Amino acid sequence: MSSAPNGRKNRPRTAGTIFQIGGKAPSRESERRESSEALLAVSDCRMVVQEFNTLVALYRELVISIGEISADCPSLRAEMHKTRTKGCEMARTAHQNLSAISGPEDGEIHPEICRLFIQLQCCLEMYLTEMLKSVCLLGSLQLHRKGKHYLGATKLDSRKEDSSDIPILEDTSSTPPDCPHTYFLVATDIENIERDMTEMKNLLSKLRETMPLPLKNQDDSSLLNLAPYPMVRQRKRRFFGLCCLVSS
């Protein structure tokens, strides 16, 4: 062992010092892993919200189609039921995913998560509006069909009272033979839509309760101007290509 110029002996580096320095690497690695997992969770949640957005737009188109017809269309009602069922499922999944990644209520929150919360809220509100429209249109279609059936029966009775010996042929082109069954099917659809509306209203209430604190403390106008934290008002920019437009 060599001696130092001042008479002290040089001691070799201990293994503890080496391991202590090397111990910081796993910490940085775990931070990178957590950050990557968080980004992946946000990306998955974004895809679910966009899928729900697309289903809301599709359901809206189907509701518009109801207003353009004057007779019952079983295939259209079946497509509406399929789209509505999947839409409710995607809404529940989106809410669960957002609640899982939102973090502590009073902590900092990524602006992308804020936008997803707002977009999901807007989509749910529009979804409820379109379901209410579909209930009104299906109900008016029922009344229209019943009115035509009643008028047809009245005309037939008045023609039967005629003393003429000419045989009367009943016009059944406008009234399907299974009217009572059709009434029952449409009424069942209306009940199912109202049930889904109740579920989505409850989900919307839960979403507003689980929103991060920065979103709860702002009014609707400031939510539309949401920007990266710290939240400040900026010029509105619209993102096109979606059913629910969210400004940032």
UniProtKB/Swiss-Prot annotation:
| Keyword set includes Protease | no
Signal sequence span is: none
Q: How is this chain modified after translation?
A: Palmitoylated. Undergoes rapid palmitoylation turnover. Palmitoylation regulates the cell membrane and nuclear shuttling and the regulation of GPCR signaling. Upon depalmitoylation, it is targeted from the plasma membrane into the nucleus. GPCR signaling inhibits depalmitoylation and promotes localization to the plasma membrane.
Keyword Cytoplasm carried by entry: yes
The record's Gene Ontology biological-process terms are: G protein-coupled receptor signaling pathway; negative regulation of signal transduction
Location(s), subcellular: Nucleus; Cytoplasm; Cell membrane
Q: Where is the lipid attached (S-palmitoyl cysteine)?
A: 243-244
Swiss-Prot/TrEMBL keywords: Cell membrane, Cytoplasm, Lipoprotein, Membrane, Nucleus, Palmitate, Signal transduction inhibitor
TM ranges are: none
GO CC terms of this entry: cytoplasm; neuron projection; nucleus; plasma membrane; postsynapse
Q: How does it sit in the membrane?
A: Lipid-anchor
The protein's predominant localisation is nucleus
Q: Where is this region: Disordered?
A: 1-32
Checking InterPro entries in the record gives: RGS7BP/RGS9BP
Q: Which domain of life is it from?
A: Eukaryota
Q: What does this protein do?
A: Regulator of G protein-coupled receptor (GPCR) signaling. Regulatory subunit of the R7-Gbeta5 complexes that acts by controlling the subcellular location of the R7-Gbeta5 complexes. When palmitoylated, it targets the R7-Gbeta5 complexes to the plasma membrane, leading to inhibit G protein alpha subunits. When it is unpalmitoylated, the R7-Gbeta5 complexes undergo a nuclear/cytoplasmic shuttling.
Hey, which family's this protein in? Belongs to the RGS7BP/RGS9BP family.
Name by which UniProt lists this protein: Regulator of G-protein signaling 7-binding protein A
Instruction: State the organism named in the record.
Output: Danio rerio
The protein's gene is named rgs7bpa
